[in-house]
A protein has these predicted regions:
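Hydrophobic transmembrane-helix bundles of small-molecule transporters
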Residues: 159-271, 303
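Extracellular/periplasmic helix-loop-helix junction of adjacent transmembrane segments
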Residues: 32-60, 298-302
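Loop-to-transmembrane helix entry/capping segments in MFS-fold secondary transporters
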Residues: 44-45, 129-139, 297, 387-396
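Structural signature of transmembrane alpha-helices in multi-pass secondary transporters
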Residues: 15, 22-23, 51-54, 58, ...
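Small-residue-rich segments within alpha-helical transmembrane domains of MFS-like 12-TM solute carriers
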Residues: 23, 27, 93, 109-117, ...
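Central cavity-lining transmembrane alpha-helices of secondary-active solute carriers
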Residues: 52-66, 116-120, 305-317
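12-transmembrane solute porter fold
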Residues: 10-21, 29-31, 161, 227-229, ...
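Helix-loop-helix hairpins in multi-pass membrane proteins, especially solute transporters
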Residues: 67-200
Length: 462
């Protein structure tokens, strides 16, 4: 590590561009599923798997990639991630073979796993105090803002230029990111780690999470009383206990459970998982207004514009609140406003224009709350991690983001489909949205009990 080097705006821009290769471009496929079906001649199931694989593989590999970044260098790992992003995007656009689409999406997931913890660790190393909080705000703008606009962006590009241009733009952005990061001094963990990579832990984790994903997304199709369903449940449970046993025995665990002895880190990570899980709100609300109210995909996207605007505006506000009052109060405030927003979006029984108003205000609260929450949460997580474990700690934190989003969408979609089939489309949407309200309440409770009231950083600033 270069002791005298301090990061500037050029490095921040390079990192943010790297971050949006996942949050904006890779996630944009959620709104171009019909286009993909037509281009690849594939059924809905195949395309759904391809769309979800990136977030899932990102979540599964992000911790291991964070640990590897600590060992081989975070700048090097970021560049590897950007190169993988280019390869994944190229595989998706060069042919009409579904197998290459799926492979490209898997590679994009591994790319995101390399980029996210490495860039967070670079920011912790080369920025300090208020400058670090500012840098993290822009990182959050890349991730939360990218996820906020990805649906509208994907639909707009696919409609005007063709869906492949999403990934052509992604390749260009990845190259720009590499050029901007070039010249940044390498940073590694100060403690030399001679232990072998936890391959066994990674294999068990992959088996467990893939099985759990199938249980959630395909449970109804398999039949909740079928042998396949119970077999998968058994695999998830057995794999979970094997994973715990393996992680306690190995010298270099994939997930270092000692990090969770730090309550603020635990609270930030759990609440981050749950508040990424409420992304299920978007898929339920968008599907409902199209199926239940006859909106087009573009009209549905317009309803959520207030979400995008507020999340981008409020991230810097969250940073300022963090500096003035510590992390707990803005995290609680943000989460509370998110819950109010989802509750307003869930008022599907309101007539016509009244529901539109409720939805627009709800999305506004949704974005406002997430924007306030983002920077205090991220700063709490990495500030409470030991310097030699910051890559692994960042990896676990971002694993919570990816898996929260992946499973939140999967759970909301499954609840919506099941509830609509057994009741009505309005009741089904309301039930699925209240599942997201419940996740928000659980996040609030995690913050309330795990994040301390006294923040030493605020006292130090005074």
């Amino acid at each position: 590590m270069n002791e005298t080097y301090r990061g500037g705006n050029k490095l921040i821009l390079g990192i943010v561009l790297g971050v949006i290769t996942f949050w904006l471009f890779a996630q944009s496929l959620v709104n171009v599923v019909p286009n993909l079906q037509q281009s690849f001649g594939a059924d809905m199931g195949t395309i759904s798997i391809a769309v979800s694989l990136t977030a899932l593989f990102s979540g599964m590999f992000v911790v291991g990639a964070g640990g590897l970044a600590d060992k081989i260098g975070r700048v090097k790992m970021t560049n590897i991630g950007l190169l993988l992003s280019i390869i994944g995007s190229a595989l998706i656009i060069i042919t009409n073979l579904p197998a290459l689409l799926i492979l490209g999406r898997v590679i994009q997931g591994v790319s995101a796993a390399c980029i996210m913890p490495s860039t967070l660790a670079i920011m912790k190393t080369y920025y300090e105090g208020a400058e670090r909080q500012r840098a993290l705000s822009y990182w959050s703008i890349g991730s939360w803002g990218g996820s906020g606009i990805c649906s509208l962006f994907g639909g707009a590009v696919a409609t005007t230029m063709g869906w492949r241009w999403i990934f052509i733009f992604s390749i260009i952005v990845a190259v720009l990111s590499m050029l901007l990061i070039k010249g940044t001094p390498e940073t590694k963990s100060e403690v030399t780690n001679t232990h072998k990579f936890d391959v066994a832990g990674l294999i068990v984790l992959v088996v467990m999470l893939l099985s759990l994903n199938v249980v959630i997304t395909k449970g109804a199709a398999l039949g909740y009383t079928s042998l396949w369903f119970f077999g998968l449940i058994a695999i998830v449970i057995v794999a979970f206990f094997i994973f715990l046993k393996v992680e306690k025995k190995v010298d270099n665990p994939l997930i270092d459970f000692k990090l969770f002895e730090n309550k603020p880190y635990t609270g930030a990570t759990i609440s981050n998982f749950l508040l990424n899980g409420v992304a299920g709100t978007l898929i339920v609300a968008n599907t409902f207004v199209q199926q239940g109210l006859g909106y087009t995909a573009l009209q549905a996207g317009y309803l959520s514009i207030t979400y995008l605007i507020m999340v981008l505006l409020m991230i810097r506000v969250g940073e300022k609140l963090l500096q003035k009052m510590g992390s707990k109060r803005p995290m609680l405030l943000g989460t509370f406003i998110v819950v109010i927003g989802i509750a307003l979006i869930s008022l599907v029984f309101l007539p016509g224009i009244f529901y539109v108003i409720s939805c627009v205000v709800g999305y506004l609260c949704f974005g406002l709350g997430l924007g306030i929450y983002a920077t205090p949460s991220t700063d709490t997580a990495i500030s409470n991690a030991p310097l030699d474990k910051v890559g692994v700690a960042s990896g676990i934190y971002k694993m919570a983001s990816s898996l929260g989003g992946a499973f939140g969408v999967a759970i909301s979609g499954a609840v919506y489909a099941g509830a609509v089939a057994s009741t009505s489309i309005h009741t089904g949407a309301m039930i699925a949205l209240w599942v997201n309200v419940l996740m928000g309440i659980m996040a609030f409770i995690a913050i309330l009990f795990a994040i301390p009231n006294d923040d030493k950083r605020v006292k130090d600033a005074k």
